[in-house]
Swiss-Prot record:
Subcellular location as annotated: Nucleus; Cytoplasm
Note: Mice overexpressing Lbh in heart exhibit severe cardiac abnormalities and dysfunction.
Modified-residue entries (Phosphoserine), positions: 63
Taxonomic source organism: Mus musculus (Mouse)
Swiss-Prot/TrEMBL keywords: Cytoplasm, Developmental protein, Nucleus, Phosphoprotein, Transcription, Transcription regulation
Protein's job: Modulates the activity of key transcription factors involved in cardiogenesis.
Residue stretches making up the LBH domain: 18-103
Protein name stated in the entry: Protein LBH
Pfam families found in the cross-reference section: Lbh
Gene Ontology biological process: mammary gland development; mammary gland epithelial cell differentiation; negative regulation of DNA-templated transcription; negative regulation of intracellular estrogen receptor signaling pathway; negative regulation of stem cell differentiation; positive regulation of DNA-templated transcription; positive regulation of mammary stem cell proliferation; positive regulation of somatic stem cell division
Family, per entry: Belongs to the LBH family.
Biased segments, Acidic residues type: 86-98
Stretches for region Disordered: 68-105
Any one of the GO CC terms: nucleus
Amino acid sequence: MSVYFPIHCSDYLRSAEMTEVMMNAPSMEEIGLSPRKDGLSYQIFPDPSDFDRCCKLKDRLPSIVVEPTEGEVESGELRWPPEEFLVQEDEQDNCEETTNEKKDQ
């Protein structure tokens, strides 16, 4: 069983209420980003001069050199590609070489 309560409110009345809200709301000029009482101002976007100063401090990125090591894998260390993958690749290469040799003959 549903209960229906009709709301006796015309669209004109709702429109009048919205107009009243819009008329009483502060304008964008009043909302503007003015300095606060403590003297600090709001800043949304970074100051371009800060960007220039930051770039001058960073002439270049630090370089990190990583050299591969050929040694025993420590316990728990993962290597890529895994040795099983390398063995499978070698087998596939050998199969391809064999088929190419048969085609050449």
